[in-house]
Amino acid sequence: MRFRWTLGLVFCLAAPRQAEAHASLLSSTPANGAVLSSSPLQVRLVFSEPIVADLSHVILASSSGRLVKLESRGDPHDVHAILAALPSLAKGGFRIDWHIISADGHPVAGSISFSIGALAAPPIRTTDAEHILDNHEPMVAGAALYPSLLRGLALSALLALCGLLGFAGYSSAPTRRQKRVCNWLSVAATILLAGHLVSWLVHVSPAKSLDSDIARSALSREVGLNELVRLVLTALAAWAVLLARRMRLAFAFALAAVLAGGVIGHPAAIDPLIAIPSKAIHLVGVAFWLGGLLWLVTSDAESGDVVTTAAIVSSVSLISIVVVALTGVIQALLFLAAWSDLFSTAYGLTLIGKAAGLISLAAFGAYHRWRLMPTPNPEGGTNLVGSVRKEIALMIAVVLLGGFLAYVPVPQMHAMNTKPTSQQGSR
């Protein structure tokens, strides 16, 4: 039965959805399919979210097969729009291919066509055009597979590091095993975040390759700087753990890196004044929850303090559960256009999966608190640690799902997905 439910969820997530996108094209000038009497001076594209104009690419294709890369810029009167000057055009059919990066760091590509003089067929897409704007990469439910997987793994390591350092810096002296785990987590988090950054730079590139010019532009803008700042803070935490041997300083850097994650992804584009602090607090709650569990399983079982440590961890976890649940609901209300999106969109179905995981984790916590912790004998402590290991495995799976969720397009009810407009949410 569980396998059937899992298979059903995967099938639903893999199915194409029409009501969701990262940033959707709302309108264009010239309009898609328009027939003009004379050559327009410029093209204007308006999207559903703020975009990073400096990272946009606009290409003009003529019926002769000629491709012209247009100089694009942001509309000074609208952060949702870009402008591109057009050369003088003769009569015939034309296609505008565009590739933009929305404020949440996700690439979107598409095209519009128009004619001058009389209705004409749009230019046939050539191999050269596909090379310039290559939107083909492994995708699941509209999310780029490799960046989302690396994001989930990196986030798991960073959150675990932050939480464990919090206990190590402000609780009793950490054991040798706990210090060793902190060392490995600091290295893993730094490497995985660096890998995610490279993967993201490839993801946002129009040609889906690591381009030095595009990387330089992306990292000099807020959308890329946020990723870079998080990586640097994590590297500083690793330095404090491995070289300086100062747990509290390492915790400060790791906590700052976790908080920096609040401005990355969907919150940067959708109600940021509420979404950013909500996500930041959400991540901190998960960090202390996961870190507490790791602190418990890495404690010295022979010292006889497992149950005492479990009581402290249980109290922290209870607070974390409440914080994570409340902030999760707030983000769901911001990102879901309607409650029906929970069951009709990939984002909603993924959110249901994450919520089910959190409920299961809460059930684990209740089982530990009221069934295993009251057991006074050593066997109870052993059983508790074994059960907590299972809870950690489930929590990592939920965090991986959260990393995937950050790349899944949120529902867009107000997007103008008209039939003649060709658009791809980096699919």
Q: Predicted regions span which residues?
A:
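Short, surface-exposed alpha-helix to beta-strand junction/turn motifs within ectodomains of secreted
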Residues: 43-72
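Bacterial N-terminal signal peptides
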Residues: 6-14
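Positively charged n-region of N-terminal signal peptides that target proteins for export
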Residues: 1-4, 390
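Aromatic sugar-binding surface patches on proteins
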Residues: 77-83
